[in-house]
Design a protein with these regions (language model features):
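Histidine-acidic metal/acid-base catalytic patches
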Residues: 1-105
Length: 105
């Protein structure tokens, strides 16, 4: 992907981080993230935030470090109560962006 971005090299061409298992190496996304960080656009594609197989806390820390102000798109199963699910996501966002172990109420 980095090679594609280097060839494209245009300010309108950006990546969308997709939270795929293939970018996790030894439990971390740091290496993959650093390869593409300079090309990151304003969209992140997330899956279920409760899934501990993906290092979401690390991702949110990296986003916070770059003052990310974009959007997070959630790919999650359909629900009969989307407002309730959004409240859960809001709480998870708060937990994932707070210092490790700290919970906001």
């Amino acid at each position: 992907m980095r090679q594609i971005m280097e060839i494209a090299m245009h300010p309108s061409v950006r990546t969308c981080w997709n939270c795929n298992p293939g970018e996790v190496m030894n439990g971390s996304i740091k290496h993959s993230w650093e390869m593409l960080r300079e090309f990151q656009g304003q969209v992140i594609h997330i899956h279920d935030l409760y899934d501990d197989k993906y290092p979401y806390r690390e991702l949110f820390g990296l986003l916070k470090a770059m003052n990310y102000g974009g959007y997070c798109l959630s790919e999650s199963p359909a629900t009969a109560d989307p407002v309730r699910v959004m409240h859960y996501y809001r709480m998870l966002f708060s937990l994932l962006t707070s210092p490790a172990g700290a919970a906001k109420s």
